[in-house]
């Protein structure tokens, strides 16, 4: 009986977390998406963070969020071991923000 209750609780948690992500994907609150992208990145859920950040990089262009969004997008692909895409985004970061906060790190990861 305890196993059944435990399994039901786990399924509820799993389904609610999937619903939360889909809700965030459809949201037009870009600051909320940004906070969730960082949350997923910090939790090493790089696929989810990359999906959100890919949209946000374009939307945030020219804003205070743009620089970190682009860097986190590159790191998200790196975390997924998609080194070619990560390298392209690190290079984009470096050329867009040559004096940015993450320039040295990006430069070191361009040719991974």
What are these regions (language model features)?
Residues 110-112:
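Conserved small/polar residues in nucleotide/adenosyl-binding loops
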Residues 15-17:
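C-terminal motif of bacterial Sec signal peptides marking the signal peptidase cleavage site
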Residues 24-25, 59-66, 94-104:
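Short solvent-exposed coil/turn linkers within tandem alpha-helical repeat scaffolds
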Residues 19-22:
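Bacterial signal peptide processing site
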